[in-house]
Design a protein with these regions (language model features):
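Short, conserved catalytic or adaptor-binding loops enriched in Gly and charged residues
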Residues: 1-4, 45-46, 178-179, 224-226
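Conserved NAD(P)+-binding/catalytic subdomain of aldehyde/semialdehyde dehydrogenases
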Residues: 3-102, 107, 237, 245-262
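Short, mixed-charge, low-aromatic patches
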Residues: 33-42, 70-78, 151-157, 174-180, ...
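NAD(P)-dependent aldehyde/semialdehyde dehydrogenase
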Residues: 92-209, 216-261
Length: 262
């Protein structure tokens, strides 16, 4: 790997507009990975007209669970699903752009099986040991719960727990991407079928994890509805798998110099 080593240089520096300006003006490809505020700031610095630019701003992710198939699971499968969801959401305390904050339950609700999911998620949290909220986390979570309940009319019901807290929504707002708290806090919404979720998919949505749907069902949904958002659709448990296709970009092709010779 000597060739790769010699062709790479990693630079770390404190916030310095002059350095960012110098690098931006000389690069052939610029990748900006950060918050919307960071993206807006760095885009102030001009690049060459031939420079390729890939932008990875704030994103929001959610899960879609088929209640009809969910309620048919065997008891041991609930914990298996909960552990997979735990890895998606809580391994990095919901800070990953692909970690779900919203769960959309699709189909006929079965209260018993629905409660089993949350009971088993609490078990997965206790067994996993990666997600251990401290007192400040708990206070911040409760404070945010009160803020949403007081200010947002979309809130139908709130359930506050030691590890996991939830808010059930009457409807999904257009600014759903600001409905994020972290610390094991999830928003929930119930729909009868896939057609009902089109309006909830904003351009900010990155990853949709799913359980209980056939790949063909989701493929038909995408073809039919052509949602503005969603760049990835993967099974629950695979939200954090990074690949060469990310945020709608083919990273290898977009970051390569391609010469068409015929």
């Amino acid at each position: 790997f000597k060739f790769i080593k010699n062709s790479n240089l990693f630079i770390r520096y404190n916030y310095d507009d002059n350095i960012t300006k110098l690098i931006s003006s000389n690069c052939d490809c610029r990748v900006i990975w950060g918050s919307d505020k960071t993206v807006e700031k760095i885009k102030e610095f001009s690049i060459q007209t031939t420079c390729k630019e890939l932008i990875f701003p704030d994103r929001y992710s959610m899960s879609l669970i088929n209640l009809n198939n969910f309620s048919k699971m065997k008891s041991k499968d609930y914990l298996d699903l909960a552990k997979k969801f735990y890895l998606d959401a809580l391994l990095f305390d919901q800070n990953a752009c692909s970690s779900p904050h919203l769960i959309i339950w699709c189909g006929k609700k079965n209260e018993k099986s629905y409660n089993k999911f949350w009971d088993n998620l609490n078990i997965a949290v206790k067994e996993g040991k990666y997600f251990i909220p401290n007192e400040k986390n708990k206070f911040d979570k409760y404070n945010k719960l009160c803020e949403f309940a007081a200010k947002r009319k979309e809130i139908k019901k709130s359930i506050n727990g030691s590890y996991i807290s939830r808010m059930i929504l009457k409807k999904i707002p257009k600014d759903i991407d600001i409905f994020r708290v972290g610390f094991g806090y999830f928003f929930e919404y119930f729909v009868k079928d896939l057609k009902k979720i089109k309006t909830s998919i904003s351009p900010k949505i990155q990853t949709l994890t799913y359980y209980g749907f056939k790949e063909s069902d989701l493929r038909n949904f995408v073809y039919r509805e052509r949602p503005n958002g969603i760049d990835r659709i993967v099974p629950v448990g695979r939200a954090l798998e990074f690949g060469e296709l990310w945020d709608g970009y083919d990273l290898i092709r977009n970051l390569s110099k391609i010469i068409d010779l015929k």
